[in-house]
Amino acid sequence: WVALDSLIEWHIESGTHGIVPMGTTGESATLDTDEHLQVIKRTIEVVAKRIPVIAGTGSNSTAEAIHQTQEAQGLGADACLLVTPYYNRPTQEGLYQHYKAISDATTVPIVLYNVPPRTGCDMQAETVARLANFSNIVGIKDACGDATRVSAIKSALTGAAQDDFFLLSGEDAQTLEMMTLGAAGTISVTANVLPELMSEFCASYLKGDHARAKILDTRLQPVHDALFVESSPTPTKWILSELGRMQGGIRLPLIPLSDQHHEQVRNAVTTAGAGK
């Protein structure tokens, strides 16, 4: 647990506003159920209520998603992030019923997660708005690739959700545009390697210093690109190892970063200011 504990402390010291164990960057797809819960438990213990912990508990099985979310709730997670079911490609009504079942079975705040390039299904704004009416479905991380989805979701919201339901970017390269349309921040890949810069970027925009946010966004764009030069989280794990933040390696079917991409990733992160 040494590397995980150290990464958490680094994030808290760098101004990160919340920790998301068992998201995509945490290799959630290749950890078994027990490992998922061990990582979530350890994260909650180390964070010790200093910042929120949003546990990744999504599954393409509704029963499994309910179980994981109930377990994370019992461990003390502040919220749970649930990706849309992947591979089985449910309809919009299927998505609604999936999240309704999870909401009905839990009390922990739920953050929806829409990432069509990885899951094969795209949760539409109208479906999000229907789900936002559940008291414990509090927000969405959207990585559909269309920043204007923020506007579509906000326009579709009704009742109390118009004020209470939040939207977060799941696409680092589009975070600035999404915040201009009303997103409240991001659940970020780049923050895993440049937490202080990403924190400053978001905080600058949200406090009204849009000029500073734009400068930082421009500075960070090469990093956003580099961290997806191969399947994420491969580049992220490689550069964290290079920076001495963790040991190298990644679980199959992903493989270590190709030699041909080392320089691009290293230069992008170093130029932007790794660890500063």
Label each region the model flagged:
Residues 45-51, 75-76, 106-108, 133-136, ...:
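Short helix-capping segments at alpha-helix termini
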